[in-house]
Amino acid sequence: MSVTENTPSLTANIPNFLANGGLPPGTGGVTTFPDAAAARAATSTYYPPDVKDPKSIDWTLGVQHSFWNDYTLEVRYIGTRGIHLDVQSIVNLADLVTPSLFLPTYTNNVPSQAALNASPINLNTILSSGDGVVPAYDAAGFNGNALTAFIPAGSSIYHGLATQLTRRMSHGLQLVGAYTYSHLIDNSTADFHTTDLTPRRQQDFEDLNADRSNSALDHRHRFTMALVYDEPFFKGSNAFTRNVLGNWEIAPIYTYQTGEWMTAQSGIDANLNGDQAGDRTITNPAGVGVTGSGVVPLCTTAIPASECTLANVLNFPSAVVGYAATNPSAKYIQAYYGALATTGRNTILGPPTNNFDATAIKRFTITERYKVEFGVQAFNLLNHPQFIPCCAAGAGPGALGGATNAVTAQAVTGSPRNALEPQRGIFDNFSAVFPSEARALQLSLKIFF
């Protein structure tokens, strides 16, 4: 038996409902366009027709050996190849700045005023060199908005050597130690803007290969050691001796991991492609350490010297012919409007994890039925600063309520990206943007009956 429920359709009396796009009559919140050309110009999202599911190809080879009755050693090689990975891109925008058309940034030997006046290229030369739209999209009419797309063009490769030593519980001692040496390379990681530490889009939308580098997920070294020591003595002693000197358990855990790779960013649309998310910095080959510098504009005498400021660069583009670093010894220099960024993706290594936790437990036997267990747990026992990257993109812990690094007592303020922009005073000062938990002790008491 079948039952049919007759439900009146809300669109039954609308002629040609599907033929007209499946939208009810009336404007409501729906935008209409006079023709297809206007619709194309207003388009801001692109769905590629050849979407492919991400794939992971894995291979491994390992050997395991047992020795000395209680020990097992395992050594493995692990490889992973990722293809068709998601990449966020703006497919219709092109760089106006190119290797053959850019404003120079000087660290020393700044040209004389006469040489600046004779410069054949100024910022306006670059701004007027094109409309910043890829010719194919321009010809098709997709030139009114940035055309954001998620395309399956990403790739990654991982190679790792993993070792693990295990001692089974014997004579009161259990041990598990592991060390991994690995390298992960990719050309995109944070396509959904889950972090500010590595850009969510590539710097040049027409050259994804230029973003191939150490992945933000690449932690080259990782070592862990976990012990459980159940003190085996006094097991056969009388109750008093066993309760006073025996029944101890100690369980330390140590973890070391190299830091996260991060990208030095200029925080400005230096390559003039309409997007500042991926713009990086200029690397000074003679720079010292991980140091940063801002820039000042170099102008012709077409404007007064007092008007030659960063704030006025776009107001007087015909007079701006270059930039000079405020700190010529810095390794990373901000790329300003029209400058050519030369820094690769993920070239700054963040602080490592260096953590030691420990647990101590003392058991007391009152009677055969009643037992008491007292425990002490110590987290970050050695009180090492653990400036671990955190927080959603665009909001550092300071923005979420004024956190403070408990170890250093330094205020945590602003977005983590602030420590990656060389023109800022907190460049490479991760303690200013990452929280760190101080040593913490936890007591526990358990009664068994």
Residue ranges and their predicted role:
Residues T11, P15-G26:
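Polynucleotide-recognition surfaces of large bacterial nucleic-acid defense/processing enzymes
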Residues G22-P24, G28-W59, Q64-F449:
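Short, solvent-exposed micro-motifs at the edges of structured domains
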